[in-house]
Amino acid sequence: ESCEYTCGSTCYWSSDVSAAKAKGYSLYESGDTIDDYPHGYHDYEGFDFPVSGTYYEYPIMSDYDVYTGGSPGADRVIFNGDDELAGVITHTGASGDDFVACSSS
């Protein structure tokens, strides 16, 4: 497989992105959270996402395990309330608490 998204030096395959989004959306649907994730993502940075809606963020982990609590790391998968992928973003290379887009293949 090749990288679907690259965040800093971390290469994520589509299966990694799908797994993180699936976990985040499952928690969103059930109204549950793990260490406050998923939570609303307000897109203060003004990304041009390919899908609309209310956005939510969930960690995507650089060790490729699905997030189950603890430190969320720098990278996030963004999805909407219809379980559509908006994108993958990262704190890596951004100032403060801002995000920048991960590069997509």
Swiss-Prot record:
CDD domains: fungal_RNase (cd00606). Disulfide bonds join 3-11, 7-102. SUPFAM superfamilies: Microbial ribonucleases (SSF53933). Its EC number is 4.6.1.24. It catalyses: [RNA] containing guanosine + H2O = an [RNA fragment]-3'-guanosine-3'-phosphate + a 5'-hydroxy-ribonucleotide-3'-[RNA fragment]. InterPro entries: N1-like, Ribonuclease/ribotoxin, Ribonuclease_N1/T1. GO terms for molecular function: lyase activity; ribonuclease T1 activity; RNA binding; RNA endonuclease activity. It comes from the Eukaryota. The active site is at 39, 57 (proton acceptor), 91 (proton donor). Keywords: Disulfide bond, Endonuclease, Hydrolase, Lyase, Nuclease. Transmembrane segments: none annotated. It is an enzyme of class 4 (lyase). Belongs to the ribonuclease N1/T1 family. PANTHER family: EXTRACELLULAR GUANYL-SPECIFIC RIBONUCLEASE RNTA (AFU_ORTHOLOGUE AFUA_4G03230). This is Guanyl-specific ribonuclease Ms. It comes from Aspergillus phoenicis. The lineage of its organism: Eukaryota, Fungi, Dikarya, Ascomycota, Pezizomycotina.
